[in-house]
């Protein structure tokens, strides 16, 4: 069957829902798709709650990551929306999902107000570089007391300000459940939320002018056509028939040619920064490429094993370690799409690092990773996120 071409007429924005597990992230995601489908039926298909909630499991290193991708459009923009429904691993995996957001909708239940997870998500959003957060004050139909709503709103604004997000961001009172049920007042609340998303999340500054780079998330074999790697283009543009290099993890890099680009199961002539695409690679076997590598313009990215990083170590309350760590600590460093074990050297004069500390560390990785200064990473122990940081200096 011939594939339809993907029309690139509107700005494309990656967003997601973050927040405490029972506050209604998934219900809100379903409500947004339904309300936009009803408002712009030509532009959107509706997605049922259970289609989103039964997110495909992505198993990585023995951890189950549930992430659901939906797409929808407003008059102004085309959105790709990620939601990781209520799984206990949500927080640990936020680093993988949140890295793909140009903005986030923080879902806070008006009935509860901000919870510890709410705080942790906002903190992680800051660490992984989500540029903008606005707020959906969900379950607002269940709170009659105007003063209580204002109090919760104030708390949420303080929370945003504490992590240097815009404390004047829109806070929209919604009821995702009532909107799904078709209650006119609350349908309108979701329309208002999406207007706020359109207006407040800045147009992403796409990195289309930089050299092409795409982290590999998954690898497939398509019978008769070859090997496809999927991921979100981090920067630059890739055209069909361009040469690329596969860098990182393995001792040596591999060159190949891109023979096809697909997005949302539609063919493109090119993929550009911010697009989730599949690239068909010429002459590459399934086992020649793996998650954690990057596909890049030849000669523009180099793999490294030693670097200095500026890190924040989660406190016990944020779900982090309960005890300090010392020199030669050996956690996993999660870069883009995969974990690599590394050995930590503490700065001169520092005996140990406590949960809740900010510090600089030197790291020696056991496998090379394609990196530049400014690249962010998570620090994990057996799949549990215990810290986050960014590369400040490459040593080797």
Swiss-Prot record:
Its main location: cytoplasm. CDD domains: EF_Tu (cd01884), EFTU_II (cd03697), EFTU_III (cd03707). Residues 138-141 are annotated as: G4. It is an enzyme of class 3 (hydrolase). Residues 10-205 form the tr-type G domain. InterPro entries: EF-Tu_GTP-bd (IPR041709), EF-Tu_GTPase (IPR050055), EFTu-like_2 (IPR004161), EFTU_2 (IPR033720), G_TR_CS (IPR031157), P-loop_NTPase (IPR027417), Small_GTP-bd (IPR005225), T_Tr_GTP-bd_dom (IPR000795). Gene3D superfamilies: P-loop containing nucleotide triphosphate hydrolases (3.40.50.300), Translation factors (2.40.30.10). Residues 175-177 are annotated as: G5. Residues 19-26 are annotated as: G1. GO terms for cellular component: cytosol. GO terms for molecular function: GTP binding; GTPase activity; translation elongation factor activity. Its EC number is 3.6.5.3. It catalyses: GTP + H2O = GDP + phosphate + H(+). Residues 62-66 are annotated as: G2. The keyword Lipid metabolism does not apply. It is found in: Cytoplasm. Residues 83-86 are annotated as: G3. Pfam families: GTP_EFTU, GTP_EFTU_D2, GTP_EFTU_D3. Mg(2+) binds at residue 26. GTP binds at residues 19-26, 83-87, 138-141. NCBIfam families: EF-Tu, PRK00049.1, PRK12735.1, PRK12736.1, small_GTP. GTP hydrolase that promotes the GTP-dependent binding of aminoacyl-tRNA to the A-site of ribosomes during protein biosynthesis. Belongs to the TRAFAC class translation factor GTPase superfamily. Classic translation factor GTPase family. EF-Tu/EF-1A subfamily. Monomer. PANTHER family: ELONGATION FACTOR TU, MITOCHONDRIAL, ELONGATION FACTOR TU-RELATED. This is Elongation factor Tu. It comes from Mycolicibacterium paratuberculosis (strain ATCC BAA-968 / K-10) (Mycobacterium paratuberculosis).
